[in-house]
Amino acid sequence: MFSRFPFRISFLAIVIPGCACLNGTTALGEWRTTQINEMSYVPLGEVAEAFAMKPTKRRKEPREIGFAGETHQLVVKTGTREVIVDGVRHWLSFPVATRGGQAFVTLADINATMGPAMSPAAVKQIGKVKTVVLDPGHGGHDRGGKSAYGYEKDYTLDVVNRTRRILESKKVKVVQSRLSDSFIPLSDRPKMTKNYDKPIFVSIHFNSAEWRPSASGIEVYVLPPLGFPISGKAPDPILDRQKCEGNAIEPASFVLANTMHHTLLGKTGGLDRGVKRARYAVLRYSNDPSILIACAFLTNAQEAKNI
């Protein structure tokens, strides 16, 4: 049952051995800003020019605006948070605005998402990953989602066990948050990185959408920067400003998420659901670069069968 979905046996092993672990803040230079809805926005054309891109003529819909260059491609939809950077979908924290026939993106989103996605070197590099902490989601009494073939907690453990064997064969140090069908408190899982050298934390899950059985694809979650909303939700003046340990390493976590997602899509052919922002406990309580991967949908008949 487990061998038909290539994602299950190789996804982390493909990405992690050569992955650089990044930390710090972006350094993308100065931008000319305009105040829109009490926020600092930057003309999208100037962002494109800074990354050596020019406007493209092709549009799939009226709100779509595209840019391309030798190195980068950028597509946005005005009035939405959706943006495609170098072929990978991302969800901005604030909508793309228009004024006077121009499109604008927030300075915050340039610094937190678009800039690091196109120029990860602008985030201070601290060296290659030396330890991978793999977290099989759920466990014990927490069964997670369910397909016609089994529970999420069993699938996540299987993915991690297979991945661990492959990574260890490549001389990568691997630590697992759980080795059996047991429940580990969510806040304890990311803390397992503290005893290891240059670690990353990767939590493995599968998606469910009983109300929409056709939903499919792969998405990777990372913590939003302090003061930013989560994907798909309006800004919350209280929750968005609550500090957590993961805020300090968010830039590094984002670069890890972007790198991982880009490679997963290329190797598995899965539907791109994007790099998204969320405040899951395993991301909030982390002191090292951390992401959560939702591999596929247990509630999608074809994906569940392949899993």
Regions found by a protein language model. Give the residues of each.
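Active-site-proximal helix/loop segments of hydrolytic enzymes
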Residues: G150-I307
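Bacterial N-terminal signal peptides that target proteins for export
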Residues: F2-L12
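Bacterial N-terminal signal peptides
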Residues: S10-N23
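Primary recognition of N-terminal secretory signal peptides and signal-anchoring hydrophobic helices
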Residues: F2, C21-H141, G145-A148, D158, ...
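Intrinsically disordered, low-complexity segments enriched in proline/serine/threonine
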Residues: R8, C19, P237-L239
